[in-house]
């Protein structure tokens, strides 16, 4: 896997939910995409918007040299992306980041996959690859409300799936931490835990599995360069009494073991 840059072609784009879009891209760069949990850095085709936007990879299709991204419109850059049509091109840098480690689980073992909001997309490729290994996946997905929920059927097709919404309009009332607590209370202990979402959700997972050796968290930090040069996305390491040791989320991450970093 190498980091490369390419003008990739938009194959299709559609809206999944309010402010949530699915973007399919085609190009040679897909050959370099292998590990779930990686992301790409996209140049906004507007002269006044200089910083690239990091967007996680939702699906990889090597046979058609396509990849799928799912993003939420948050500002001027993603607003531009949402207006683009099939046939147009985007300047893509990637794949970036380390990706999830799926070597620690084997066929017949169980993995909890936990996602919240816009942290859900990269977990689909992860679940797909774990399925291919024969790992039993159990999904715990949280949304703000039924209105903004997406990709439910896709995850359900891969394995057991539990949903929660903040307002109780779909699935359990509350957050995914409640779903995890209920699963643990029933004696369901996973061989590995993979999660991506807001910092509060990741902290809850860290507290639920304080000594588990295989809890992997994908951190959502603001990024600028995406290649570890600017130090805009650092987080501190656990066990560092000086507070001076840090890791770069874009380059050394975005995935870390829960035992490694301070959330």
From Swiss-Prot:
Cofactor: [2Fe-2S] cluster; FAD
Keywords per UniProt: 2Fe-2S, Electron transport, FAD, Flavoprotein, Iron, Iron-sulfur, Metal-binding, Pyrimidine biosynthesis, Transport
GO biological process: 'de novo' UMP biosynthetic process
Organism superkingdom: Bacteria
Family membership: Belongs to the PyrK family.
Function: Responsible for channeling the electrons from the oxidation of dihydroorotate from the FMN redox center in the PyrD type B subunit to the ultimate electron acceptor NAD(+).
Protein name: Dihydroorotate dehydrogenase B (NAD(+)), electron transfer subunit
Organism this protein belongs to: Enterococcus faecalis (strain ATCC 700802 / V583)
Chain's gene name: pyrK
């Amino acid at each position: 896997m190498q980091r490369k840059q390419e003008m990739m072609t938009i194959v299709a784009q559609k809206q999944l939910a309010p402010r949530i879009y699915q973007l399919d891209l085609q190009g040679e760069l897909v050959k370099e995409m292998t590990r779930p949990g990686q992301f790409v850095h996209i140049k906004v085709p507007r002269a006044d918007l200089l910083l690239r936007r990091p967007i996680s990879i939702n699906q990889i299709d090597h046979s058609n040299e396509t990849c799928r991204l799912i993003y939420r419109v948050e500002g001027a850059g993603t607003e531009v992306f949402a207006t683009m049509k099939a046939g147009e091109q985007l300047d893509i840098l990637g794949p970036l980041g380390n990706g999830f480690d799926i070597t620690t689980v084997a066929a017949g073992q169980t993995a909890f996959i936990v996602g919240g909001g816009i942290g859900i997309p990269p977990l689909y490729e992860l679940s797909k690859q774990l399925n291919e290994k024969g790992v039993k996946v159990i999904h715990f997905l949280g949304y703000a409300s039924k209105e903004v929920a997406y990709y439910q059927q896709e995850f359900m097709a891969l394995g057991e799936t539990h949903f929660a919404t903040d307002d109780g309009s779909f699935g359990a009332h509350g957050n995914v931490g409640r779903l995890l607590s209920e699963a643990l209370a029933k004696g369901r202990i996973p061989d590995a835990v993979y999660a991506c979402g807001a910092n509060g959700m990741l902290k809850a997972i860290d507290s639920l599995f304080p000594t588990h050796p295989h809890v992997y968290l994908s951190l959502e930090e603001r990024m600028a360069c995406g290649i570890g040069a600017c130090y805009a996305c650092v987080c501190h390491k656990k066990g560092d009494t000086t507070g001076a040791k840090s890791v770069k989320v874009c380059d050394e991450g975005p995935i870390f073991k829960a035992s490694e970093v301070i959330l």
